[in-house]
Amino acid sequence: MEVKLWLQHIDKKELTRSITLPTSEINMNLFEYSNGGIQKFNVTKYESDCNLLLYEGENIKKFNKALNELNALATTDEVIALTELYPQDDIYEILEYVKEKQYEFYPNKNFNDIVEEFELDNEITIEELVNLGYSQLSTGIIKEY
């Protein structure tokens, strides 16, 4: 079983590349932490110069569970798109709404409330989501990059 990781060079804003790792490689040793959040994807034999942007694949729920167990998901500074929990069109519309509202931040509103509040009918690819330039999209936290 494998997990696909989208990566961004630590000195650049744009998406650089993706890699696929076996789930046996996904563990706390992959990451550096600061203030409880993932700061850097840090495995030299793979891509030591990159941040983890987001992940997808058959084992997304398993990987999500592992991140939660590390108390990293809610505080990470990287983009994490929960593409199996929320359809991609939902994510796109939410990001567009936040952009229109001058990147308002909703710390006290959970993701489901935001999803229900807007009509969500657009489509987006993983690459487009990353290129929108947001540094955080997880558990109801939406923030401009």
PLM features per residue range, with description:
Residues 1-27, 143-145:
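Short, extreme N-terminal segment that most often corresponds to the first beta-strand
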Residues 26-91:
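Structured domain cores in non-transmembrane regions
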Residues 28, 52-54, 80, 103-105, ...:
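Hydrophobic transmembrane signal anchors and adjacent membrane-proximal interface regions, especially
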Residues 64-67, 71, 95, 99, ...:
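Residue-level detector of alpha-helical secondary structure
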